[in-house]
A protein has these predicted regions:
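Hydrophobic alpha-helical bundle cores within soluble ligand-binding/oligomerization subdomains
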Residues: 1-261
Length: 261
């Protein structure tokens, strides 16, 4: 049954010419979340929902097509390439990394990306899923509901914490320097992304999982500072503010090590 489902998802990775044309018109300055939002909406026009009974098929199609949508736009807007989005990778994460880098990912990268997607799926009842449910409760179609969710996740008060954490960490090449600069940020009461959680109060169990994978990737790429800086920032935030790293924090280094822009 699992094998059949994997093969089904593989068969749904292609993009229609109309969708590819739309993606080619989006500038490279666009945020990937905006690209995904638009891609989902266009897909809903090209593959219209005829009734609630086939929503599962539409959900499978979106699972397969979203990595294709993001990667096609990225490769065309940044490198002028029109890529074939139909790979033979067994996993969604492997499919995405293959399209992003133009080659089949290593077993380690494939596994890490799958773990990452699972961890982010385990995010309880948050703003984006709530937005999707509100939209669905009006008996709107599934593409509208998912588009609503993507638009909600686009907001900085909900999504983007790993991106913000990555931007912060990239400024520091030494743990000692990172501690000094972080203390300055705290003195100025500046927001430090990637810490605390609305539901978890003592720790985020997802953080422990992704942190382990970040360390493995750090060793693989012979990282000189990013993982050590991340650990120091985590320790300082716990010491100074009694705040724990959430799932987003070590995703910053994890994605950096895998070459995800």
């Amino acid at each position: 049954e699992l094998k059949d489902y994997i093969e089904k998802l593989k068969s749904l990775r292609g993009l229609q010419p109309e969708l590819r044309s739309t993606l080619e018109g989006i500038p490279k300055t666009a945020h990937p979340m905006d690209v995904l939002r638009t891609g989902c909406s266009v897909l809903g026009n090209l593959e219209q929902e005829e009734g609630f009974l086939n929503q599962t098929d539409h959900a499978d199609r979106m699972l397969s097509a979203f990595p294709s949508i993001l990667s096609y736009w990225y490769q065309f807007s940044h490198h002028g390439k029109r890529i074939d989005t139909e790979t033979n990778d067994d996993t969604i994460g492997g499919h995405f990394l293959h399209l992003l880098h133009g080659k089949k990912p290593s077993q380690l990268h494939n596994q890490v990306m799958s773990v990452s997607l699972i961890l982010y799926a385990e995010h309880e009842f948050n703003a984006s899923t709530f937005a999707a449910r509100v939209c669905a409760s009006t008996l709107s179609d599934i593409h509208s509901a998912v588009t609503s969710a993507i638009g909600t996740l686009r907001g900085p008060l909900h999504g983007g914490a790993n991106e913000a954490a990555s931007a912060m960490l990239s400024q520091w090449n030494d743990p000692d320097v990172a501690e000094v600069e972080l203390l300055k940020m705290l003195t100025k009461k500046q927001l430090v992304m990637g810490f605390g959680h609305a539901v978890y109060t003592e720790s985020d169990p997802r953080n422990e999982v992704i942190k382990q994978w970040s360390k493995k990737l750090s060793l693989e790429v012979n990282d000189k500072h990013l993982y050590d800086v991340s650990e120091r920032v985590e320790a300082v935030m716990r010491r100074e503010k009694n705040l724990f790293a959430n799932a987003d924090f070590y995703h910053a280094s994890t994605y950096e090590f895998m070459g995800i822009p």
